[in-house]
Amino acid sequence: KVALVCLYLLFLLIIIAALAPVIANDRPLYAEYKGNTLYPAFADQSRTDSIFTSEGKLDEVLQYDITDWRTLDFNKVIWAPIPYSPESMDRYNRDYVSPNGKQRFKNKEGVITDAPRKFRHLLGTDGIGRDLASGLIHGTRISLMVGLVSMGIASLIGIFLGALAGFFGDNKLKMPRIKYHFTLIGLFFGLFYGFGHRKYALADGFSQGILNGMLEILISTGIIILSVTIFRLISRLIKVNKLQEETFVPIDTFVSRGIELLNSIPRLLLIITITAVVERSIWIVMVIIGITSWTGIARFTRAELLRIRSLEFVQAAQSLGFSSARTIFKHALPNALAPVFVSIAFGIASAILIESGLSFLGIGVPDDIVTWGS
C-alpha cells in the first residue's frame, strides 16, 4: 500500500506538470470581450487580436504578451485557479508579501485597492513580485523533465558500458594489438575534437533548444565514430607480424576505473564546476547531470551481466553462433534490468535535488526559468 501511495503521488505530479498552464496562468482560459470569443491561455504569447466595433471599425488591438488582462471589462471570463504565471511580476506586491498579509490590486478603473479573493497570492510573492504558488506548479514540469531527461542520458551510458564490462570482462574480447592501440588513439582524438574542441558549438546548440543541442551531440558522436574508424583503417596498413598478434581488451578494467574516478570526485562539486564555465541553460544542466550520474547504473548492470553470462540460456545462444551484440542486447540485457530500474528511480529523485540545489545557488539555470530551487 505504501508503494501505491508513492505511485499515486507520482501520477499526481505528472498531472500537475501536464496541466500547469491551465492551473496557473495570468491569462484567462476563456473570455468574451466586446463580442469576441478569446482563449488567451492557449494562444502564443506573440499573438495579437484586433477587436472591431459592430460597425466594422477597429476598436482595439490586444497584444497577448503585454496586455494586462485583469483590467479589461469582460462580458464573461474564466480564470485559472491561480491567475498568475511564474514569470509575471506583480509590482504592487513585491518584497515577499505574506499570504495572509495585505495585498494590493489595480482594478479596472485603475485604482489601487485591496486584492479580491480570486487575485490574492495564495502562497505570497518573492522579492520581485512573482507568485510562489504558480512557481511551484510550473516548477513541477521543469523538475520532472530534468529528472527524466538527465537519467535517460545516464541510463543510456550506464547500461551500455555496464553491459559491455559485465559480459566481456577482461578476457573475452580479443583484437589485433595494432588495432587495439589505434582504436584508443582514435577514441582520444575523437573525444577531443568531438566534445573538447566543439564545446562552444554544443553550448550554442542547447541555448537554441533541445533539438539543436541533440543535433550537435549527434555531430560530436559522428566525429568520434569517424576518428575511430579512420585510425582502425590506418592500422590495417601496418603489416608487422608482432603487432598483428591478438590481445585481450580489458573493457571491464576501463569501465571500473572510470566509475571509480567519477565516484572519487564529489558529484555536486563537479557539476557546479562545469556549469560555472558553460552557458546557462536548463538543457545543458540536464546533460551535465546525466553524464555524471551513470556510474551507479553501470555498476548494477555490470553485476547482473556477470551473473547472467554464465547461465544456460546465454551459453546456448553463444553455442548457436549468435553474435555478441545479439546475445547481449536481445537475451542477456532484458533479464538484467530489474535492479537497474530501481537505481534509475532513485537517480531521478537525486537529479531533481541536484537541479534544485543549483537553482537555489543561482548556478546553471537561467534567471527567467522558475524551478523548485529558485
Name the predicted role of every residue range.
Residues R141-S155, R280, L306, A325-G357:
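Transmembrane alpha-helices
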Residues Y8-L12, I137, V149-L156, G258, ...:
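Hydrophobic residues within alpha-helical transmembrane segments
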Residues K1-S155, I159, A163-K242, F329, ...:
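Gly/Trp-centered helix-boundary motif
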Residues L218-I259, L268-K330, V342-I348:
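Membrane-cytosol interface at the C-terminal ends of specific transmembrane alpha-helices
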Residues F160, L164, S323-S324, A336:
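Short coil/turn motifs that cap or connect alpha-helices
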